[in-house]
Amino acid sequence: MELLAPLTGIVALLFAFYLTNKINRSDPGNPRMQEIAVAIHEGAMAFLMREYRTLIFFVLGMTALIVVAGFMTRGAESMQPATAIAYVAGTLCSIGAGYIGMQVATRANVRTANAARHSSNAALDIAFSGGSVMGMAVVGLGLLGLGIINYVFKNPSIVNGFALGASSIALFARVGGGIYTKAADVGADLVGKVEAGIPEDDPRNPAVIADNVGDNVGDVAGMGADLFESYVGSIISGIALAAALNIPNGTLVPLMIAAIGIVSSILGAFFVKTGEGANAQKALNTGTMVASILAIVGTFLATRLLPAHFTAGSMSYTSTGVFAATIAGLIAGVLIGRITEYYTSGDYEPVKEIAKASQTGTATNIIEGLSTGMLSTVLPILVIVIAIIASYRFAGLYGIAMAAVGMLSTTGTTVAVDAYGPIADNAGGIAEMAELDPKVRKITDALDSVGNTTAAIGKGFAIGSAALTALALFSAYTAAARITAIDLTDPKVVGGLFIGGMLPFLFAALTMKAVGRAAFQMIEEVRRQFKSIPGLMEGKARPDYARCVAISTGAAIKEMIVPGLLAVLVPLAVGLIPGLGKEALGGLLAGATVTGFLMAVMMANAGGAWDNAKKYIEGGQYGGKGSPAHAAAVNGDTVGDPFKDTSGPAMNILIKLMTIVSLVFAPLFMQL
């Protein structure tokens, strides 16, 4: 039974291989389209390889630290040098998923554009297949690596190292990718749209290739690494708590639910079909719904592996209660996605209010957008609170972990739908730059519009899953560190709470400033090219795309280091400093989880709302493109870009990474 998980991971990778071959056999279009696609592909892969080369030093340092700490706590059962093997495996699997997804996404984009010359259904098929490769790579490598590590070592504490490896890569991928894409996006929008008055994806814009590369490094590789981390983190939290609470077969159930989720996602992918002129959103929703229903049925069967009645700690629970806790997580994920859609879609009042406020200038646009983001935290918090209380009543701490597993059981489908968006967006950019028939751009714009909605829902889902996963990992940490309660009368704990509450703000400041510095360089370069290259604005000369790509790449690699180290070093420092220790660290994790979740929701939703308010005006409202309201909305969207694509999403990984660092090094903290 234990081998079923890694075998299912292999099935996912085989399905990804089948989809890759299908995409590669598709027509990549005319020479001009292929030339543009090659530039995007080479820029994306160059960034990814440079990022991975930079991370080698971090991985080697962390590996050495784990080995040293393992020998220092050799007498402690849970801290062993072998944890370093699991850590390296986690980093390699995360890197592998990102590499596979990026390779295929940057090939699917041009083929989607070419397919749109024939039919919208063909374009949807290619774009979703490209997204599905990323989805299957995430769940396939995640479950294969995790399943093998669990089977070989049969020690949940060693398995924790796999989650640490996944988290380490995820944070750098999210931050680095977010800085890259937003530096390019801000430069392309402010100088191209506002100052030069040229449309989006216009080939005269020097930052246009960097902008399209950024869609891939941020929204494909970065997003995939984020959900890869949540996926393995939720499973590992379930395994760790089951082992700590001595639940019979409890370590097996999370792996089985994940395996069932992979099969459900594969079957659901075959239902993403639509007729000509039909709604692509409906097709994606159908595939997601089929996968979710199959996962629910499979989860019920998987929980039958548990005894009908069992004891965890001093409490008695049932297998039916575990099933109910898992479903509570799944429902919470769906609800948070829908709440996110309400606050970020142009179909609803919040975005329309921001568009309306744009009529009186940038200031009122910013004020309305910020207030919308803050207001959007209320319902997700209530949903998470209800899910936590319900899952705890159903199955205790193990129930909270299983709620996170349930929410992430169909990660294969979630990533596929999310990664579909940037592929469709790139296809539209290629169609514009290659000067294809306007009908092609109309089809790709329709697919991209759906992609914007799915991306917003995906961000909400990622944030919700991060909160539950972080809480489950926090529960595993308290069990490993033998902390029975967080005592709010203890000054050390209160100090930890305040430090933890501050960290997401510091992290957001560092990442926002990084985007600002990188965008400044990009804006200066784009302005320079418009002024110094004769005939560029008339379309008679070609801009220096490579220079803008180099600026984004260099800035992203340089600026991702400090925020990444912050998430690892702060919990280690608090846990090791005399007078603070494991209790203060518990307070820090609690404080960071609360404020980090709130910041993530606020920033992601405010940014998404600003973006769609701009698109709402571009659709013809309040004067349409070129109007004063549109200029204000573009400025608001530019502020929102690092909110929704850099700082907000990276906040998810911050709270999970700090918790998993604490969990892995808990034996070391206990011996001080």
From Swiss-Prot:
**Annotated Mg(2+) 2 binding sites:** 212, 215, 425
Topology in membrane: Multi-pass membrane protein
* Record EC number: 7.2.3.1
One of the record's GO molecular function terms: potassium ion binding
**A GO CC annotation given for this chain:** plasma membrane
Residues the record annotates as the site (Determinant of potassium dependence) are: 455
State if Magnesium is listed as a keyword: yes
InterPro entries, alphabetized? PPase-energised_H-pump (IPR004131)
- Binding residues for Ca(2+): 611, 637, 641
Domain of life of the organism in this record? Bacteria
Kindly list the residues the record flags as site (Important for ion transport): 174, 219, 226, 645, 656
Record's catalysed reaction(s):
Na(+)(in) + diphosphate + H2O = Na(+)(out) + 2 phosphate + H(+)
| UniProt record, GO biological process | sodium ion transport
User: Main site of residence?
Assistant: membrane
Outline the subunit composition: Homodimer.
State the function annotated in the UniProt record: Sodium pump that utilizes the energy of pyrophosphate hydrolysis as the driving force for Na(+) movement across the membrane.
- UniProt record similarity statement: Belongs to the H(+)-translocating pyrophosphatase (TC 3.A.10) family. K(+)-stimulated subfamily.
Q: What is this protein called?
A: Putative K(+)-stimulated pyrophosphate-energized sodium pump 1
**Species of the source:** Moorella thermoacetica (strain ATCC 39073 / JCM 9320)
